[in-house]
Amino acid sequence: MLKYIYMHLSHKYNHILFTYNMRIYLIKRNHMLFTHMFTTYAYIM
C-alpha cells in the first residue's frame, strides 16, 4: 500500500516537473521566434 502511494506521488511529481520543463522550453522557443520575427520585420521596415 505504501509503495503504491509512493509510486503514485513520484509519478505525479514527474508529470508536474515534465509539464513545467515543457512550458519553460516553449516559452524560450517562442521568445526566440518572436525576437527573430521582430528583427526581420524591423529590417524590412
Swiss-Prot record:
The keyword Chloroplast does not apply. Keywords: Eukaryotic host gene expression shutoff by virus, Eukaryotic host translation shutoff by virus, G0/G1 host cell cycle checkpoint dysregulation by virus, Host endoplasmic reticulum, Host gene expression shutoff by virus, Host-virus interaction, Modulation of host cell cycle by virus. It comes from the Viruses. One of its GO terms (biological process) is symbiont-mediated suppression of host gene expression. It is found in: Host endoplasmic reticulum. GO terms for cellular component: host cell endoplasmic reticulum. Inhibits host protein translation, probably through the EIF2AK2/EIF2S1 signaling pathway. Promotes cell retention in the G0/G1 phase. Belongs to the asfivirus E66L family. This is Host translation inhibitor E66L. It comes from African swine fever virus (isolate Tick/South Africa/Pretoriuskop Pr4/1996) (ASFV). The lineage of its organism: Viruses, Varidnaviria, Bamfordvirae, Nucleocytoviricota, Pokkesviricetes.
